[in-house]
Each structure stands twice: as C-alpha cells, then as structure tokens.
Regions:
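N-terminal localization/anchoring segments of enzymes in phospholipid and broader phosphate metabolism
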Residues: 1-327, 345, 349, 361-483
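Hydrophobic alpha/beta core scaffold segments
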Residues: 352-356
C-alpha cells in the first residue's frame, strides 16, 4: 500500500535513530516474585524504549525537517548528523559473494585458520600435557579447540570432580556450553557464573543460563555491585594420589567466534597455588563476596590496583638506586588516575616505560620533565588487539602477568577481574618477546607524541606487521608439529 499516493514527494531521506543502551538493572523496580534472570528479561525489553541519543540522516538536508525531528524525538539539533555513507552496513558481509576470486585475492586478506599450538602433541590427552608443563594459547594464531578439548576430556573423565567457570560473552553456537552440560549430566559438579549484564549479550547469556540449568549445572548471575569480567576456569580432579587441578585464566572471553578475530592469551596450568586462589575466587563469588587478599593472583576490586602500584613503586626504588628499571604494559585502555599518577612518578625517577594501548590513553607521553621516559603505541590491524600483558622489572627479575583487566577505574575498582602470574620461564620469555615484537611494529602501529597525536613510527627500515609476524610464526610451528 502506498500511503503517499495523494502527496507529491519533494525530498526523501533515510533515518537512523540510536537509542541509549545504558540499562542498569539495579535502578529498576525489582519484583519480589521475580528471579534475577526474569528481572533481566524485563529490563532488556526496556532498551527499545530508551531515550534517543543520536539521529543520522542520509539524503534530505532540509532545515525544517531537522527541526521537526528534533522536537518530536526530543533530541538536540547538535545530536543530529548528516551522513554521506549508507546508514546500514550489514550488506557488506554479503559483498564477498559478488567479488571474483581474482579480486578477492588482490583486495582481501588471505584466509587464516588458527593452528594447533606448537606445545601440544596431536592425539595426546590435553589434560596430561598440561599436567606435565604450563601451556599458553595465543589467539587467533592458536586454535581455541585445544581448550574446548580440555573441557570435553574433563566432562567424560571419571577423575573429574568439578568444573567451575566465569562466563562474560559466548558465541551464538557455543561448544563450551555443550561440554559443560555433558559434564553435569555425567554427574560432575558444574558451577557457572554467568554475567547477565554483559552489554548487548544479555539475551544470549540468559538463553544459555537456562540451557545450563536444565542440564543440571548450578548457575549464578554475578554480583549486585560488581560485574564479573574475569576469565577463569577451575577443573578439580581426584585420583589414587589425591586431589589435583587444572586452571585456565585468560584475557578474553570464551567466545569461539571472537577467538578468531581478537588477539587474546590463555594460560593453562596445574600449579596448585594458582588453583587454590582461583578456588577462593569462586568461593567468594558463591557467597556474594569478593576476594580481599591474595599471594599469587591479582584480583580486582580489592587486590589488583594496589598490587600494581606496589610493583611500580618497586621499579621506582630500583631506578633511584641506579639500577635498570622497566615497566611494559599491553592493554585496551588506560584511564585509572592512581595508576597514571604512579607511572608519571616512575618516569620522573628514570623508569623506562613502554605501553601498547589500542584505545583510550589518558596519559600523554614525552612531556618534558614529566613523562620523558614513557612511550605509548597503538596497534590497529586485521585482528582486534584485546590481550593484556603486565611486565614489571628487567634483567632476569621480570614479573609477568596476563589479565582480563585494563587499567580503567571501572576494571580496577568496579569489576571482578583476575590477573595471573607467569611462573613458567619459557612462557614468560615468549610473552616478553611478543611484547618486543609489538614495540617494533612499524606497519600497523602508531606512536603517540607529547601533543596527544598519533603518528607513523620513525623506524621504517624493515617493515614489520606484528600480527602478520605472529600468524606466520604459528603456521610454521604447526607445520613443524605435524611433520
């Protein structure tokens, strides 16, 4: 039906309204008859009715239309934008079907399939190999199938007593859920802490929480005051010699899709000290509490920021004593004021500080007398840089961590986050070498100057794309494993 048949169309435009997505479940009235999952379902429905915060117009430029829409939508004219580009880019994913093989060859990245990690032997039990030595997976260069195989083995293994895991985001078709359900059906104790407030994944997480509960898993829904953003899986087993553990702690979600698109790290270890502290994390969360003190893990909100500051102080002491001092940080964003103030103090003391920060960085490097010893780089390449690495110290006394936390106040003080120390010497050196490679990137990296501008690195002698280097290395290692 043409509703405009009696009118003359003088101009036309495509409109796109963006609504606020900021829903806080704790701000809404909680009905006593609802469980938290039911409450979240109601809250998500509210998102479609939230206030418009932006209007984009493609086509019509008429001022009166702009004024009319501003009044009707209750949105200021400064939040109305004219666009030359299409407002809906979903069609882009279908373009590859319209492009010839030759055009794809010249204009697209070469297909990349994550490889088997070089430290794993095909056909040998993943559990057995982790018990022999700590293992590190580097996504997307290594396949996530290794971790999924660990869950599959544990779900069937008679020695498995329990599997405990924190989940923030999952793929739409998650094999991880399949094996957690299988473990519960096989009589294992399965505890899943499912964060229902993961923005734009609330509905997916709600659906999976129902599937997990139906299979017999115990599902918890996070904490009232803190989002649970940590990536921890603790598998407890028992044989004739006693209790033993496999702990996995990573920087990224258990999402099989994004593990092929994001750079992330995942440590799998049989270290008892790490396992016992991971168990404390789960015990505290089960009681609606947070861990207050640790000896090995860094656990936000109570013992991550303060321990990081302590390690920065230690480097300051080394610098003041005339000894080599170093801090290397790789993360998504840096906004934590306390940590930034301490980094500035470290720079003044002579500590060399290298940072690879993809997104927000509120600390300006290279300011004379303040941040002379700080270098900031951002890498934006084929894959989304998402891993977090902390390095404190140099000359054989390095402390190295991988973590779920950026140095943002929301992460250090308002979320449950976990950073794990790397005790295996080979893995520690592997991470340091990876960090050095990122610092040497002069293709996809940009350096921030003292004015806050990002520029192409000066060193252009030999082009180095760090992501390309890592995936070529992964292919070569996989080839050697299979040969």
């Amino acid at each position: 039906m043409n509703y405009l048949s009696n009118y003359t169309v003088e101009e036309k435009a495509v409109l796109c309204i963006t609504r606020s997505a900021d829903i806080n479940p704790d701000d809404e009235i909680y009905e006593s008859t609802d469980d938290y999952r039911t409450h979240m379902k109601k809250v998500i429905k509210m998102r479609a009715r939230l206030k418009p915060v932006r209007l984009e117009i493609e086509g019509n430029r008429h001022k009166e239309i702009k004024k009319y829409l501003s009044e009707r939508l209750n949105i200021s004219e400064q939040d109305i934008f004219k666009s030359q580009a299409p407002l809906d880019l979903k069609y882009v994913y279908k373009l590859t079907d319209k492009v010839s093989k030759e055009e794809r060859k010249n204009g697209c990245y070469r297909p990349f399939v994550p490889a088997l990690n070089r430290d794993f032997i095909p056909g040998v039990s993943v559990t057995k190999q982790i018990l022999e030595e700590d293992k590190l997976l580097s996504f997307p260069f290594d396949s996530m199938d290794t971790f999924i195989e660990l869950l599959k083995e544990s779900a069937k293994d008679k020695e498995t007593l329990s599997i405990k895991i924190t989940i923030y985001r999952l793929a739409r078709q998650a094999r991880i859920v399949k094996y957690l359900c299988e473990a519960a059906e096989n009589g294992k104790e399965v505890l899943v802490l499912m964060e229902l407030r993961a923005r734009f994944d609330e509905e997916n997480n709600i659906n999976y929480s129902e599937i997990l509960e139906e299979a017999g898993c115990k599902v918890m829904y996070g904490m009232e005051d803190y989002k649970v953003h940590s990536k921890v899986c603790l598998i407890t087993k028992k044989n004739s010699r006693g209790i033993y553990y496999i702990t996995q702690i990573g920087t990224g979600n258990y999402n099989e899709k994004t593990s092929r698109l994001y750079t992330d790290l995942s440590l799998m270890t049989a270290n008892v000290d790490i396992a016992l502290e991971a168990a404390e994390v789960f015990q505290a969360l089960s009681m609606g509490e947070t861990v207050e003190e640790t000896d090995h893990l860094l656990v936000a909100p109570h013992c991550l920021q303060n321990k990081v500051i302590h390690m920065i102080d230690r480097e300051i002491e080394h610098a003041k004593a005339g000894e080599p001092a170093y801090i290397g940080l790789k993360m998504n964003s840096l906004t934590d004021k306390k940590i930034m103030e301490k980094l500035i103090k470290a720079s003044k003391a002579g500590v060399k500080i290298d940072m690879v920060i993809r997104g927000i960085c509120c600390l300006i490097p290279g300011v004379k007398g303040e941040t002379d010893n700080i270098q900031v780089r951002s890498i934006v390449g084929r894959y989304l840089e998402h891993s977090r690495i902390y390095i404190f110290g140099t000359k054989g006394r390095e402390k190295v961590y991988i973590a779920s936390a950026d140095f943002m106040t929301r992460n250090t003080l308002r979320r449950v986050e976990v950073a794990v120390p790397i005790y295996n010497t080979d893995i520690k050196m592997q991470l340091i070498e990876m960090f050095i490679t990122m610092l040497s990137d002069n293709v996809k990296a940009r350096e921030e100057d003292h004015n806050g501008n990002y520029k192409i690195p000066k060193n252009q002698d030999t082009p180095l794309n760090s992501q390309e280097f890592f995936y070529k290395q992964a292919y070569l290692n996989a080839k050697n494993v299979n040969s």
